[in-house]
Amino acid sequence: SMTIYDNKGWVVVNNSHVIFAIDLNTFKEVGRIENLTSPRYIHFLSDEKAYVTQLWDNRIFIINPKKYEITGYIQVPDMTMESGSTEQMVQYGKYVYCNCWSYQNRIIKIDTETDQVVDELKVGIQPTSLVMDKYNKMWTVTDGGYEGSPYGYEAPSLYRIDAETFTVEKQFKFKLGDWPSEVQLNGDRDKLYWINKAIWSMDVTASHVPVRPFLEYSGTIYYGLTVNPANGEVYIADAIDYQQQGMIYRYSPEGKLIDEFYVGIIPGAFCWK
């Protein structure tokens, strides 16, 4: 993943156990943080403090971005190193919320003053995304695991969670065998998008998921999704077959194709400057 902070791009490379800080104009490295386990996402609390989630580790790392140093750890309860999985983070007041994905079923709540997990909320099997809308409602979608999984297999769901009370307000259920992922918000944070073979969209105040998708499934592999925060245009990454160059499609907010272009192999994430 990549996050922009302090006029730098922070590129989190999980397989290389490192975070690179790069110049946004030249893409040249200006610093790095090493000795991470398998970093996934970074969330900045201040110029001198950030959290880094991990795969295959039961700790969230605390780092000092100015010094490019690891300064501490947050131990996640009831999680082993082998089953460790923390992912995306959102913040409400002094609390940071994080979804626990691989062989997990929880959203955890972290007090940023004490760097301790103070609460957790159980959802379905393997919550894959976490975003916060304009009404301070968190959204996560579960993938339901897979058939034969030792952790279980169930129909996935989309959840709306109130950040103030840390309770589930609404659960939107999918069919067994569906594989929803990549929950995103538009710039106004009042419209939700996600992938479930097709591309789907709905208002954050909706009472049910739509019957028709925003974009129909075309037999390809939609692998990444983002929405331009300035104009609402939707960008979709197509992995095609995981072997050749991927394709990016750009659509208007009304679902009309504007542009398409090739990128590298398996495009999966976007970052807006």
Tell me the role of every PLM-derived stretch:
Residues 1-273:
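Predominantly soluble domains enriched in secretory-pathway, periplasmic, or organellar proteins
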